[in-house]
């Protein structure tokens, strides 16, 4: 099957998206708990009953057992495990890391994963620790590339399974780049990023950030990113915010064996707990004293179940934070419970500001909460300060995060939606022409001249509504974020001021008429786009002669859209210059 990956919503660098597999559609970000058939603490059937939609298991462990191998080939992996959700399989790469070798070739394990019906499979790459020597790392990279090339030569034979390609290289950035570039050329379905062993065990999150961001900057943005080995719920929000779409780990079980009780903020020792600070089914029906008195096997199973419930709850919260556009707030909250995670957050915001900003939505429906020094470095805050240079009005108000802000931006995100205890209420009201001129200059990163517009306000709340200029309605302001939504007349006015290709998406001639009649602008329709377009930007769609076709809202970034599937939506049309065709338009994904 071909890759179907569609972004529905963005926040930070996270994507609420749909991934179709032959066993069903996953909503990402998602956590894949590891199931070890040799140590079945919680069975896949029990996981399914807990609400888990996807799991990962080690195909090498199944392959190595004659009994399991025969059953998997005969019945399929889903039947063998008793799980009808999405099953991802690892290739045995972790065994290479732990033991130095596996008793199977890359081609054998690829064919085996395909034959047992894995939804998502992986090549035999070579995971590395942060303490590996340069020479050994080079050898591992060469082996990973050879195995990736072997997969590419077998692509047709292995169709109908989604395949993960994972670059390696450890802490040697040049090796990571070399491996990533080759993996990109081979065009896997799913991008993999291997967490750096040892460093992760030492809570060295900075090393993980640098490794992930190096790979993310090279691999195609239009594919999902799987971050191997990330399993503590306290880190899900953070790693989703930097662009990871899925995670896997056996930590829920390994921690349970050690008597460790997961929370969204860290880990507690069962021996030190007097009351369970959780209302999951396990904690609601047992108390710590009772669990401590159980046998090791019973205790481990209950703790593992609790740890899984917490992991499920947290990944749901991450998805909800993306929907509500408050993911950075969740990241900031979680990072304050571990100094290494907070240090990694500050490192991320300082070092990768441009890469983060390129995917950050321009507007959000949720307010921005200033909670510490990291708030000054958030990508939307840095962008907002940078865009103020396009505005030349004397009236100002002061904001801690932004400095002096033109009064005309009083109601625009993020200035009017920032919650900071040191900011005073702004009493002054901007003039109508001040609002429209400042907002357009900010929105389109271009200094507009003074526009003598007239505003219509809500009689009950005073909220800005319609905007008129010379007797024509040119647009309206969206109440929750103050963004200007142009009409077709407004779009024509904006085009008359903006230099080409500012604010525009240019559609190829073949697709001009269908877009002019209201069809979504798909990636394959686009000839050129303003690279400063961000998710939720208000965009003007034109033909190759720079004639207005439509207005709409961006789903993707202007610097990443071309890396997505040709059928992925880029601009959702709001208004169009021609009536919709009487014929039924082609079915599109909006």
Swiss-Prot record:
**Family (UniProt):** Belongs to the archaeosine tRNA-ribosyltransferase family.
Molecular function in Gene Ontology: pentosyltransferase activity; RNA binding; zinc ion binding
Q: Where do the annotations place substrate binding?
A: 125
> Could you say which cofactors this protein requires?
Zn(2+)
**Which NCBIfam families does the UniProt record give?**
arcsn_tRNA_tgt (TIGR00432), tgt_general (TIGR00449)
The protein's name is tRNA-guanine(15) transglycosylase
Catalytic site? 90
Co-factor binding details = Binds 1 zinc ion per subunit.
All copies of the PUA domain together span: 502-577
What's the stated role of this polypeptide? Exchanges the guanine residue with 7-cyano-7-deazaguanine (preQ0) at position 15 in the dihydrouridine loop (D-loop) of archaeal tRNAs.
The beginning of the lineage is: Archaea, Thermoproteota, Candidatus Korarchaeia, Candidatus Korarchaeales, Candidatus Korarchaeaceae
Q: Please tell me which top-level EC class this enzyme sits in.
A: transferase
Chain sites annotated for binding Zn(2+): 278, 280, 283
| Pathway noted in the entry | tRNA modification; archaeosine-tRNA biosynthesis
Keyword set includes Secreted: no
Q: Where is the signal peptide?
A: none
Query: Gene encoding this polypeptide?
Result: tgtA
Q: Which reaction does it catalyse?
A: guanosine(15) in tRNA + 7-cyano-7-deazaguanine = 7-cyano-7-carbaguanosine(15) in tRNA + guanine
**Gene Ontology cellular-component terms listed:** cytoplasm
């Amino acid at each position: 099957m071909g890759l179907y990956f569609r972004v529905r919503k963005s926040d930070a660098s996270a994507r609420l998206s749909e991934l179709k597999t032959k066993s069903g559609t996953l909503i990402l970000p998602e956590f894949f708990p590891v199931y070890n058939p040799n140590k079945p603490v919680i069975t896949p059937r029990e996981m399914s009953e807990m609400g888990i939609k996807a799991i990962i298991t080690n195909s090498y462990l199944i392959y190595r057992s004659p009994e399991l191998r025969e059953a998997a080939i005969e019945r399929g992996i889903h039947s063998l495990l008793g799980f009808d959700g999405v099953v991802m399989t690892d290739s045995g790469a972790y065994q290479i890391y732990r033991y130095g070798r596996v008793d199977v070739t890359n081609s054998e394990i690829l064919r085996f994963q395909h034959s047992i019906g894995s939804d998502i499979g992986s090549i035999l790459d070579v995971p590395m620790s942060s303490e590996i020597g340069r020479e050994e790392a080079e050898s591992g990279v060469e082996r990973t590339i050879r195995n990736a090339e072997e997969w590419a030569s077998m692509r047709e034979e292995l169709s109908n399974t989604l395949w993960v390609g994972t670059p390696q290289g450890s802490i040697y950035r040049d090796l990571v780049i070399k491996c990533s570039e080759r993996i990109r050329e081979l065009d896997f379905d799913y991008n993999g990023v291997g967490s750096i062993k040892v460093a992760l065990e030492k809570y060295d999150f900075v090393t993980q950030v640098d490794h992930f961001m190096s790979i993310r900057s090279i691999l195609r943005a239009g594919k999902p990113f799987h971050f191997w080995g990330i399993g503590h719920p306290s880190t899900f929000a953070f790693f989703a915010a930097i662009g990871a779409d899925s995670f896997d780990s056996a930590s829920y079980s390994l921690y349970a064996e050690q008597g460790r009780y997961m929370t969204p903020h860290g880990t507690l020792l069962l021996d030190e707990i007097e009351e369970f600070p959780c209302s999951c089914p396990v904690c609601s029906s047992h108390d710590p004293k009772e669990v401590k008195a159980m046998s090791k096997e019973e205790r481990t199973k209950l703790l593992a179940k609790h740890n899984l419930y917490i992991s499920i709850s947290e990944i749901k919260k991450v998805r909800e934070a993306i929907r509500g556009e408050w993911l950075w707030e969740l990241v900031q909250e979680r990072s304050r419970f571990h100094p290494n995670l907070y240090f990694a957050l500050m490192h991320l915001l300082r070092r990768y500001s441009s890469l983060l900003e390129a995917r950050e939505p321009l507007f959000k429906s949720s307010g921005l909460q200033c909670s510490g020094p990291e708030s000054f470095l958030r990508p939307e805050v840095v962008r907002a300060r940078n865009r103020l240079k396009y505005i030349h009005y004397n009236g100002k108000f002061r904001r801690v995060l932004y400095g002096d802000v033109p009064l005309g931006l009083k109601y625009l995100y993020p200035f009017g939606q920032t919650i900071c205890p040191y900011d005073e209420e702004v009493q002054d009201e901007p003039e109508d022409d001040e609002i429209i001129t400042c907002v357009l200059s900010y929105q389109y990163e271009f200094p507009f001249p003074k526009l003598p517009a007239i505003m219509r306000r809500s009689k009950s709340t005073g909220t800005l509504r319609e905007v008129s200029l010379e007797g024509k309605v040119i647009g309206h302001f969206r109440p929750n974020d103050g963004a200007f939504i142009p009409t077709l007349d407004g779009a024509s006015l904006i085009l008359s001021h903006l230099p080409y290709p500012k604010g525009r998406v240019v559609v190829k001639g073949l697709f001009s008429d269908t877009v002019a009649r209201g069809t979504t602008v798909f990636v394959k329709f686009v000839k050129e786009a303003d690279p400063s377009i961000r998710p939720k930007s208000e965009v003007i769609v034109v033909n190759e002669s720079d004639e207005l076709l439509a207005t709409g809202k961006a789903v993707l970034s202007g610097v990443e859209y071309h890396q997505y599937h040709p059928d992925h939506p880029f601009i959702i049309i709001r208004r169009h210059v021609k009536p919709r065709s009487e014929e039924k338009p082609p079915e599109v994904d909006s």
